Amino acid sequence: MKTPRLLQYLAYPQKITGPIIEAELRDVAIGELCEIRRGWHQKQVVARAQVVGLQRERTVLSLIGNAQGLSRDVVLYPTGRALSAWVGYSVLGAVLDPTGKIVERFTPEVAPISEERVIDVAPPSYASRVGVREPLITGVRAIDGLLTCGVGQRMGIFASAGCGKTMLMHMLIEQTEADVFVIGLIGERGREVTEFVDMLRASHKKEKCVLVFATSDFPSVDRCNAAQLATTVAEYFRDQGKRVVLFIDSMTRYARALRDVALASGERPARRGYPASVFDNLPRLLERPGATSEGSITAFYTVLLESEEEADPMADEIRSILDGHLYLSRKLAGQGHYPAIDVLKSVSRVFGQVTTPTHAEQASAVRKLMTRLEELQLFIDLGEYRPGENIDNDRAMQMRDSLKAWLCQPVAQYSSFDDTLSGMNAFADQN
């Protein structure tokens, strides 16, 4: 981060409140890592903290870990560097904590650790990127056929609680064609992390997976760092020429962690209680994936909606940055329709770049069919639909059940791209 210091400045904490420490530290920078020791004459590091704010004569730090056992007598030692982690092929098949430490393995180690990387870095420049031109085959009919994603695209999965976000993530991990899968579980329940690890243990792709976690009981700065670490791991494999798929679950809890850190450092709340820096930091993370001349990172970010009816400024901000979104419907989930993707409310902004004219024409025909069925649903609910009055409506009603069955797909069922196009073509020809 900076040149080596000739003098090292130390400080005692003036205030410890939860995970926040205030001290008169000089010559430190935002994001810098500080070691915490029992005394100035002791070398044992008992904790670490990260600089998150600078005020007049005081520095605000956020603990990495909890404050249990700390006292007024501990000493803060600036390290002059930002938080970094060792990454390499050794993390494949492993579970990492927010500091990059391997806490569990579900496959044997394949290679030694090879490189130390700072986890909070700027996105790649436009000159180093390449366009999204190749489709990403996910094996999910609704996505491959009607919402085709591209290699290097960034997609959001928007849903309220209980709509099947985790189920869709499992499908994408099991069926998507990629070299490496990096999963970041940010602010999730401990039970969900356990279940996800169990799923990966049983997966035939476990040797390709890396899981980074920071559960809801972790300090805010740890939750922020976990998302950055997951992205850093994905960037490492992209630089090795790999095709990487990155999952962050969830961006909503990452944004809340950013908010907590910003408020603790003294920032004032702005939109919906979020300080302005949160809206600066979101694109810094979301712009890091993408395709470069070496490899690619295709990213899926889940966003938890507070309500399907009310406007959500954080969800709107994330949606505006990404290259598309999959909207999961609570109504479809309640009907047992999984994956509960509301195709008409979802969009892939690179669809036209990764599909053939024939594919695009067929998808348009199926969308028109779905739009007509949605319009007819009101008449059906009111008992006003009369067969024989409109031949186009009758044709759409005849295909309704088969279209619904085609859009539904069990978690373990894989649909090849050719089969998906063939099934979609059957609906387009009848429409």
Swiss-Prot record:
One term under GO cellular component: cytoplasm
Residues annotated for ATP binding in this entry: 164-167
Keyword Heme recorded: no
Impact noted for substituting residue 191 to H: Lack of ATPase activity. Exhibits a decreased ability to form oligomers. Defective in type III secretion and invasion of cultured cells
Listed result of changing residue 51 to E: Retains wild-type levels of ATPase activity. Drastically impaired in its ability to associate with the membrane. Defective in type III secretion and invasion of cultured cells
Subcellular localization: Cytoplasm
Family: Belongs to the ATPase alpha/beta chains family. T3SS ATPase subfamily.
Function: ATPase component of the type III secretion system (T3SS), also called injectisome, which is used to inject bacterial effector proteins into eukaryotic host cells. Acts as a molecular motor to provide the energy that is required for the export of proteins. Required for type III secretion apparatus (T3SA) formation, proper protein secretion, host cell invasion and virulence. May play a critical role in T3SS substrate recognition, disassembly of the effector/chaperone complex and unfolding of the effector in an ATP-dependent manner prior to secretion.
Domain remark in the UniProt entry: Binding of ATP leads to conformational changes of two loops located outside of the catalytic site. These changes could be critical for interaction with the stalk protein InvI/SctO or with chaperone and effector proteins during type III secretion.
Oligomeric and partner information: The core secretion machinery of the T3SS is composed of approximately 20 different proteins, including cytoplasmic components, a base, an export apparatus and a needle. This subunit is part of the cytosolic complex. Forms homohexamers. Interacts directly with OrgB/SctL (stator protein) and InvI/SctO (stalk protein). Forms a complex with SpaO/SctQ and OrgB/SctL. Interacts with the chaperone/effector protein complex SicP-SptP via its C terminus. Interacts with the effector protein SopD.
Alphabetical list of PANTHER family matching this protein: ATP SYNTHASE, SPI-1 TYPE 3 SECRETION SYSTEM ATPASE
Name of the molecule in the record: SPI-1 type 3 secretion system ATPase
Taxon lineage: Bacteria, Pseudomonadati, Pseudomonadota, Gammaproteobacteria, Enterobacterales
